[in-house]
């Protein structure tokens, strides 16, 4: 079993694949270094002398600079490494010399649902979407009272509550409206009840304008203040929606019609070595099959955005990527926050030292394929291949944004563990085997086998594709079995 990994030949650190005790001789890639102190799993150890102020190189890229001289064998972490990041950057388009679509592969099929508008779906559910937080508990009771309607090919009745829809103005109000309308359009929802109170800022007329044309058999509306008994009214509407949703049956659909979101949270020092590269390889495989993948978490691209921007398929896509990156930095600065105020305490405990360190691991999920498009918050994926989406690093907010963009399911890598799920089925992918063994009720797929030397990244990615096809065909994720699913909406302004 390998002790450590030397990710790039030019790196001056290695990453411990397992805990390394002080005095242990570590041999990797022709290097032989004795650990001068204990090195926890996922943490970095110097393999060359590093002077005070000299860059610490990991992934072949500076992830910060040393704040003290370090001899080979030294533990390199927050106590002796600091970020190099600052504010906005003026980028230039330098497309990678090997920038080209990957060779095509005949797509496999999954057993999904074909909607009347031609779109594919992997779940056949009824959703209740509240337009305002005031009706959250009403929506929950409607779900509880009508579970008997979940029969035949109908796979669930769910609501996605939130605190917004009123006391918001301007951009926040528009984002809430746009996000909720996007959820109503999601193909995994066979039928939708849009539930409102009646006096909120987000009026029925505004929502209809945002939603645009819709199937009146698929989407129904209920305003609680307009009826004597909202529960009786909802029952009648939900019966109609159930009759509509029950018409759909699973049938073979090519994998090329899938949209898959890619996310990491509770990352550790192995995230960029096991789970995220596996997801990246999977993303490339999806692109080869004509499918679509979505990468977000813009603040966790800071410091590594150049890797992605050089892969933009053309200058127009590059300009959109540049605007997205610097726009998010402006958002931080406008709130008097530094752009590098990341990683989290859990990230640091797992071995991630700086935002560049975290970002270099994060962008591994993007694989090697060209970036075909950059899309805004609440906008749908319209281009096959790899897409970048405007959204924060926050797990719930970014996963909700990917669902709203049309992701049928989400791949979520984690080194620390998390139980949550978006409305779209969310597969948890562990970076290390101890986590998979400890939290077997949370984790769907273990890439710790790569660190254990049992499988290669290519082998793990093929296994992951097989799992995605099974989940798309109806196999439940761990979170689905527990009934976990929720949303969180991005906000930036005042609450009235």
What are these regions (language model features)?
Residues 1-409, 416-496:
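Metallocofactor- and cofactor-centric catalytic cores in central/energy metabolism, strongly enriched
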């Amino acid at each position: 079993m390998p002790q450590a990994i030397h990710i790039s030949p030019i790196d001056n650190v290695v990453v411990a694949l397992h805990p390394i005790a002080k005095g242990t001789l570590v041999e990797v890639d022709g290097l032989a270094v004795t650990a001068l102190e204990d090195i926890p799993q996922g943490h970095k150890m110097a393999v060359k002398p590093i002077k005070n102020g000299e860059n610490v190189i990991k992934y072949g890229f500076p992830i910060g600079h040393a704040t003290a001289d370090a001899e080979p064998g030294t533990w390199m972490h927050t106590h002796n490494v600091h970020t190099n990041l600052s504010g906005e950057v003026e980028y230039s388009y330098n497309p990678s010399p090997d920038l080209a679509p990957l060779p095509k592969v005949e797509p496999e099929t999954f057993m999904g649902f074909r909607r009347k508008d031609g779109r594919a779906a992997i779940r056949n559910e009824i959703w209740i979407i509240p337009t305002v937080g005031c009706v959250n508990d009403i929506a929950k009771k409607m779900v509880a009272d009508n579970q008997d309607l979940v029969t035949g090919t109908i796979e669930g009745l769910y609501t996605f509550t939130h605190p917004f829809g009123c006391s918001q103005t301007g951009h926040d109000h528009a984002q809430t409206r746009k996000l909720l309308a996007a959820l109503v359009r999601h193909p995994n929802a066979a039928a939708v009840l849009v539930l409102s109170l009646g006096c909120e800022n987000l009026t029925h007329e505004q929502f209809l304008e945002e939603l645009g044309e819709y199937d009146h058999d698929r989407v129904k509306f209920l305003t609680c203040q307009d009826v004597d008994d909202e529960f009786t009214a909802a029952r009648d509407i939900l019966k109609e929606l159930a009759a509509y949703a029950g018409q759909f049956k699973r049938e073979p659909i090519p994998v090329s019609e899938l949209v898959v979101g890619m996310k990491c949270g509770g990352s550790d020092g192995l995230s960029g070595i096991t789970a995220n590269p596996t997801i990246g390889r999977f993303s490339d495989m999806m692109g080869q099959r004509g499918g679509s993948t979505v990468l977000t978490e813009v603040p966790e691209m800071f410091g590594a955005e150049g890797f992605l921007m050089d892969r933009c398929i053309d200058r127009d896509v590059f300009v959109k990527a540049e605007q997205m990156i610097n726009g998010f930095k402006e958002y931080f600065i406008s709130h008097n926050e530094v752009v590098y105020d990341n990683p989290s305490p859990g990230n640091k405990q797992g071995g991630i030292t700086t935002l560049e360190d975290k970002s270099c691991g994060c962008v591994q999920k993007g694989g090697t394929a060209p970036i075909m498009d950059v899309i805004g918050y609440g906008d749908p994926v319209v281009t096959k291949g790899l897409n970048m989406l405007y959204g924060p690093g926050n797990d719930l907010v970014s996963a909700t944004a990917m669902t709203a963009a049309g992701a049928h399911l989400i791949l979520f890598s984690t080194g620390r563990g998390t139980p949550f799920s978006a409305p779209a089925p969310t597969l948890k992918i562990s970076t290390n085997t101890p986590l998979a063994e400890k939290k077997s009720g949370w984790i769907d797929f273990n890439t710790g086998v790569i660190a254990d030397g049992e499988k290669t990244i290519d082998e793990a990615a093929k296994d992951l594709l097989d799992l995605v096809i099974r989940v798309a065909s109806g196999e439940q994720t761990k979170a689905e079995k527990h009934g976990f699913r929720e949303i969180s909406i991005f906000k930036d302004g005042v609450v009235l």
